[in-house]
């Protein structure tokens, strides 16, 4: 069934236009309240947000929707997405809500929903919410005495900080390490430096001065250049870059070289296998992960299981088949022993645990394999379905034929932005570049 509001990661769009308005947020709150208001107990929902200006608009609208359906609302303020997921379970809430557009610029915002178990909602539940958003909400309003209340939870950040610290080996500290942490002027701007400081590190901060407009602006995991420069300038041991809602992480070694999610997953898989804590003979990643990771894991006797793009699909497969390590090349790392969704800070602590356990620099620990040449191009379009065009389909078939068995193509429509993503990968870099550029040119021509 086609979706009207939800994409691959909740509802997302440009703030105060289209589906990302106060009116839509009100209806999301009412509809989700309708779906999750079950039984006779006092119902509650928790709401967190990142640092975007539009969060001030969406938070009260959602609160109004939920309270009108008789649900109490606990407000966290700026807090990472994985913290909202964790606190949904910890506070025995019926539903968790994160207001964020993740790695997007401040103009965008989004609404992510978590069930009482802390996991993102299934497609079926999201479709049920969509149905109620457009059908008869007024018939299910709470009575005058049954309205919900709203309360701000002052210690939400402290609760999450303690949770994250407990994922780090008790016998270790971060003393002696100089760490650059880039918080993308986002949701983790307070909690991430505090965690590292409390564990004993010397902390150098980047992107910790949000103003409502500068989230992800030339900083964070999608723009790690400032973090890398700070590592070199301050002679740090490691750099850590989170995105706007801190569910992604990218690492930099002491030379300022970037280490992506594939390398991080490989490191955690190897370490957990050695520790005997890997719950399955492999990990779960998406079709975007580099073939180099697959070959490296194979050398360890481990499998790489691929899903479609989106950390929710990675998590679904992990839950169904018993895996406890998974994620995406972009830095969504899901460690199911500790969290129900991607948690950039917890993933970074696992890298730091390996670093502290040995006497080698990050450059020797984290560069596990040489990735195959890979090129990703994003083509923006205004309307329609460019991938259904006959010329585009023919260009894709020709590209697949040219690559043959030496490479692969992944071409898909983004679930969060009006983009077509064209990714090519293979042993021959020149061939990969040529194939991707040719396909991108045809898409650009037909999407103009």
Curated annotation (Swiss-Prot):
GO terms for cellular component: cytosol. Keywords: Isomerase, Magnesium, Metal-binding, Phosphoprotein. Binds 1 Mg(2+) ion per subunit. It catalyses: alpha-D-glucosamine 1-phosphate = D-glucosamine 6-phosphate. It comes from the Bacteria. The modification Phosphoserine is found at residue 102. GO terms for biological process: carbohydrate metabolic process; peptidoglycan biosynthetic process; UDP-N-acetylglucosamine biosynthetic process. GO terms for molecular function: magnesium ion binding; phosphoglucosamine mutase activity; phosphomannomutase activity. Its EC number is 5.4.2.10. SUPFAM superfamilies: Phosphoglucomutase, C-terminal domain (SSF55957), Phosphoglucomutase, first 3 domains (SSF53738). Mg(2+) binds at residues 102, 243, 245, 247. HAMAP family: GlmM_B. This is Phosphoglucosamine mutase.
């Amino acid at each position: 069934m086609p979706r009207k509001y939800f994409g691959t990661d909740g509802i997302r769009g440009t703030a105060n236009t289209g589906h990302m308005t106060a009116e839509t947020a009100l209806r999301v709150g009412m509809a989700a309240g309708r779906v999750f208001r079950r039984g006779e107990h006092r119902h509650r929902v928790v709401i967190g947000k990142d640092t975007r200006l539009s969060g001030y608009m969406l938070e009260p609208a959602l609160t109004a929707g939920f309270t009108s359906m008789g649900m109490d609302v606990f407000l966290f303020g700026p807090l990472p997405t994985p913290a909202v997921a964790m606190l949904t379970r910890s506070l025995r809430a019926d539903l968790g809500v994160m207001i964020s557009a993740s790695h997007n610029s401040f103009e965008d915002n989004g609404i992510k929903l978590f069930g009482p178990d802390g996991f993102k909602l299934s497609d079926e539940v999201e479709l049920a919410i969509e149905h109620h958003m457009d059908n008869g909400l007024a018939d299910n309003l709470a009575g005058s005495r049954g309205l919900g209340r709203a309360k701000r939870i002052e210690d939400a950040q402290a609760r999450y900080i303690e949770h994250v610290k407990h994922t780090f080996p008790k016998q270790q500290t971060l003393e002696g390490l100089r760490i650059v942490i880039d918080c993308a002027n986002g949701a983790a701007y307070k909690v991430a430096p505090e965690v590292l400081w409390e564990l004993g590190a010397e902390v150098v901060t980047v992107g910790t001065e949000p103003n409502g407009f500068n989230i992800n602006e030339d900083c964070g995991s999608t723009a790690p250049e400032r973090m890398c420069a700070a590592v070199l300038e301050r002679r740090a041991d490691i750099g850590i870059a989170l995105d706007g809602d801190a569910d992604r992480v990218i690492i930099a070694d002491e030379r300022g070289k970037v280490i992506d999610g594939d390398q991080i997953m490989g490191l955690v898989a190897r370490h957990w296998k050695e520790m005997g804590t890997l719950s399955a003979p492999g990990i779960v990643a998406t079709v975007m992960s580099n073939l180099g990771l697959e070959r490296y894991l194979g050398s360890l006797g481990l499998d790489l299981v691929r899903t479609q793009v989106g950390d929710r699909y990675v998590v679904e497969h992990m839950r169904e088949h018993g895996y406890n390590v998974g994620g995406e090349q972009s830095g969504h790392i899901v460690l199911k022993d500790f969290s129900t969704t991607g948690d950039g800070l917890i993933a970074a602590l696992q890298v730091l645990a390996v670093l502290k356990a040995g006497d080698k620099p990050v450059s020797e620990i984290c560069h596990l394999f040489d990735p195959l040449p890979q090129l990703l191009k994003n083509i923006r379009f205004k309307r329609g379905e460019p991938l259904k065009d006959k010329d585009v389909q023919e260009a894709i078939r020709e590209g697949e034929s040219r690559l043959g068995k030496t490479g692969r193509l992944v071409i898909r429509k983004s679930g969060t932005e009006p983009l077509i993503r064209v990714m090519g990968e293979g042993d021959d870099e020149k061939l990969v570049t040529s194939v991707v550029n040719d396909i991108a040119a045809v898409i650009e021509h037909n999407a103009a």
